[in-house]
Amino acid sequence: MSCQAFSADSFTTLAGDSLPLLMHHASAADCLPSSASTHTHNMVSAVPSGLSLLQSSKRSHMHLSTSTLGNGPPGLHYPVTPCHYSNQQTTYGMMAAQEMLSASISQTRILQTCSVPHPNMVNGANTLQGSLAPCLYKFPEHGLGGGSCSLSHSFPPLPPAVLSEEPPLGGTKDLRLRSRPPDDPPDMDSPQIRELEKFANNFKLRRIKLGYTQTNVGEALAAVHGSEFSQTTICRFENLQLSFKNACTLKAILAKWLDEAEQAGALFNEKMGMNERKRKRRTTISLGAKEALERSFREKIKPSSQEIVRMAEGLHLEKEVVRVWFCNRRQREKRVKTSLHHSSYLTKDSPTYRYPYLSPNAIKP
């Protein structure tokens, strides 16, 4: 069956009793004209008579008045006389799959043709009164068409969760968890912050005491943990310019490095102490011993070794202390004499400044 678009020339005047032929069917086929409905009925009735009946007839009593049809669009008036529909019985049999598919395709094409009115129908509505009545009724959602006269059955309805803009109850909890901001750092007066500040200050003092710079620490950590550690990282940690999470992570690493550095420094100091010559403690000479040594120096500037031993025993001092004192005293005396000699030489050889003599004749009024 081929479907062609309706035109103004293809419509013929229908009788009043033939117009509502399929009004009792609650399906999309209710919009069809009498010729299309007759064709559809013939296709359904072509099923073999041996098949069992599945659906009983529907009885409906409808009363169509002229006032009801007057509520339609302006300009389309159909002179339909009030009528009372009698009981009609329609039998639907079991259709084969191929015949069911062909019937559905035919009905869909006819519905598409009926749903889109031709422009000539609107323009020539006055001349075609009574030829075709529009589908103005809302039928129950059951029957072959599965709905009203629209083409909504061609597209599956969207679920209400997609149409609604508000998220479902279960999704609201997930959205809150996803949009939850990260954990805020603790307050400035919290024990964690105070402990972190204390460790940063202690780390800086111990690092300086061990003789390491921030660059040394950064290079040592970068060799083990990667290139993300540098002098800038250590500086920001000591100045508490890192985030709380990063500072806590770096604190554990620096604490471990500091313990290892102190152990290595202790071993190094022990080795250096064994090889290094011990320096003697500075000796303090009392005032009475200094006066005795000064008297001995005035008597003899450079005493012999036996005299130094005798003076050391008398003053309860070591021999080396007395010997060093006489050496230092001679050097100081030499510096004093040199400075005095140089100052006297400058006073003798320095010329005196004399003012020039001016004669009275040289002065002009």
Swiss-Prot record:
Residues 160-191 are annotated as: Disordered. InterPro entries: HD, Homeobox_CS, Homeodomain-like_sf, Lambda_DNA-bd_dom_sf, POU, POU_dom, POU_domain_TF. Residues 278-337 bind DNA. A motif (9aaTAD) lies at residues 5-12. GO terms for molecular function: DNA-binding transcription factor activity, RNA polymerase II-specific; RNA polymerase II cis-regulatory region sequence-specific DNA binding. CDD domains: homeodomain (cd00086). The keyword Chaperone does not apply. Keywords: Activator, DNA-binding, Homeobox, Nucleus, Transcription, Transcription regulation. Transcription factor that activates growth hormone and prolactin genes. Specifically binds to the consensus sequence 5'-TAAAT-3'. The 9aaTAD motif is a transactivation domain present in a large number of yeast and animal transcription factors. Belongs to the POU transcription factor family. Class-1 subfamily. This is Pituitary-specific positive transcription factor 1. It comes from Oncorhynchus keta (Chum salmon). The gene is pou1f1.
